[in-house]
Curated annotation (Swiss-Prot):
Designated name of the protein: Acidic leucine-rich nuclear phosphoprotein 32 family member E
Residue stretches of biased makeup (Acidic residues): 148-205, 215-235
PANTHER family cross-referenced by the UniProt entry: ACIDIC LEUCINE-RICH NUCLEAR PHOSPHOPROTEIN 32, ACIDIC LEUCINE-RICH NUCLEAR PHOSPHOPROTEIN 32 FAMILY MEMBER E
Residue ranges, annotated region (Disordered): 147-256
Localization per Swiss-Prot or TrEMBL: Cytoplasm; Nucleus
Function: Histone chaperone that specifically mediates the genome-wide removal of histone H2A.Z/H2AZ1 from the nucleosome: removes H2A.Z/H2AZ1 from its normal sites of deposition, especially from enhancer and insulator regions. Not involved in deposition of H2A.Z/H2AZ1 in the nucleosome. May stabilize the evicted H2A.Z/H2AZ1-H2B dimer, thus shifting the equilibrium towards dissociation and the off-chromatin state. Inhibits activity of protein phosphatase 2A (PP2A). Does not inhibit protein phosphatase 1. May play a role in cerebellar development and synaptogenesis.
Subunit description: Component of a SWR1-like complex. Interacts with H2A.Z/H2AZ1.
Annotated Gene3D superfamilies: Ribonuclease Inhibitor
Primary gene name: ANP32E
Residue ranges of the region described as ZID domain: 204-256
Keywords: Chaperone, Chromatin regulator, Cytoplasm, Leucine-rich repeat, Nucleus, Repeat
LRR repeats: 43-64, 65-87, 89-110
Any one of the GO CC terms: nucleus
Length: 256
């Protein structure tokens, strides 16, 4: 795909001045020149044009906010002075896999005052004797060359650093919020307590009901006993009267 078409595709209906990152890797440049990029990409901070067969940076637009520029695996052999003119705030530049052969070509990067990291891996210049010391002497503003500083300490991965920062923030949030599940357990305990209270109330209601039932039954039994006693007394009275009447009846019969 041609570079101009690729740019239109990557925009995704955005205006050029709204874009901060643009990746054009593996598309085809026009005769080794940049095409489709212009000064309207003024908010661009990251631009990648790896393996697009570039031979020249002459048509690179002014990108004053650009911080990172990926130009690996192209055919660039010189003309690096344009970078300081149009991208003065570059901090990272990757020129690995290009046709850079000597220190004179790299000297043009001295005017990139904010440059901290430079990659020249797989360029012929890396075959020079004392290559690393020479580059650090020439470009004293840089900290990392081909991923390592002068003491061979590896450059940190900015994305990993951001992830670690996010993890630390998350840990702090968790610490402030308390151990996970703590509040849930408290809620469960509260719920359990309320359930227990309800159970005790139900049990008390049940006991009081049973006690009332027993008392009522006892009252009924007492009433029954009293009624039975009255009936027995009435029966005894009737029998007594009968016994009294019998002698009288006998006396009457004798008189007869």
């Amino acid at each position: 795909m041609e570079m101009k078409k690729r740019i239109n595709l990557e925009l995704r209906n955005q205006a050029p001045e709204e874009v901060t990152e643009l990746v054009l890797d593996n598309c085809k440049s026009s005769n080794g020149e940049i095409e489709g990029l212009n000064d309207s990409f003024k908010e661009l901070e990251f631009l990648s044009m790896a393996n697009v067969q570039l031979t020249s940076l002459a048509k690179l637009p002014t990108l004053s906010k650009l911080r990172k520029l990926e130009l690996s695996d192209n055919i660039i052999s010189g003309g690096l002075e344009v970078l300081a003119e149009r991208c003065p705030n570059l901090t990272y530049l990757n020129l690995s896999g290009n046709k850079i052969k000597d220190l004179g070509t790299v000297e043009a990067l001295q005017n990139l005052k904010n440059l901290k990291s430079l990659d020249l891996f797989n360029c012929e210049i890396t075959n020079l004797e004392d290559y690393r010391d020479s580059i650090f002497d020439l470009l004293q503003q840089i900290t990392y060359l081909d991923g390592f500083d002068q003491e061979d300490n590896e450059a940190p991965d900015s994305e990993d650093d951001d992830d670690e920062g996010d993890e630390d923030d998350n840990d702090e949030d968790e610490d402030e919020a308390g151990p996970p599940g703590e509040y849930e357990e408290e809620d469960d305990e509260d719920d359990g307590g309320s359930d227990l209270g309800e159970g005790e109330e139900e049990e008390e209601v049940g006991l009081s009901y049973l006690m009332k039932e027993e008392i009522q039954d006892e009252d009924d039994d007492d009433d029954y006993v009293e009624e039975g006693g009255d009936e027995e007394e009435e029966a005894e009275g009737i029998r007594g009267e009968k016994r009294k009447r019998d002698p009288e009846d006998e006396g009457e019969e004798e008189d007869d």
